[in-house]
Amino acid sequence: MQQNGDSLYARYCRMGRRFEISGGLTLAAAIAGHVTTGGNGLLSVLMVVGFVLFIFGAMNMKPSNMIRAFATQLSATNDPDFAKGLIDAMEKNGVTALSKASLSSLNLAINTYAASEGADEEIVTRLCDAYKKHVRKTMF
């Protein structure tokens, strides 16, 4: 699944940044065109597209969303690459507060991977340690 030795976490972060940058550039170009030409419908559509791309990128870079995305993929596939990506997402973002739904998704992913055939014990231990050190429940 991995290419060029990149971790899935690094690829996920790069993709989020690409969305932010392309959205920001599209939005800036559409605003500049709107200001210089006095506006038109196509430029308004481009502004919306740029804004949406920027928001998607920003939301993907939010630590709680990263953890939930990797947890969802891990529980669906039981792939050790997604387990390593989940570990990276928890460790590289410091202490992350998760909602009840995200916590249950994360617990499901860890338990499903730990119970699967051929689960690497070292990865399971690292998942549990990262969970204990870097995840806490939100206040509400």
Predicted features and spans:
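Cytosolic juxtamembrane N-terminal segments of multi-pass membrane proteins
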Residues: 1-16, 131-134
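Hydrophobic alpha-helical transmembrane segments
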Residues: 29-52, 58
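Short, aromatic- and cysteine-enriched interfacial helices/patches
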Residues: 42, 55-58, 138-140
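Charged, low-complexity cytosol-facing tails and large interhelical loops of integral membrane proteins
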Residues: 74-140
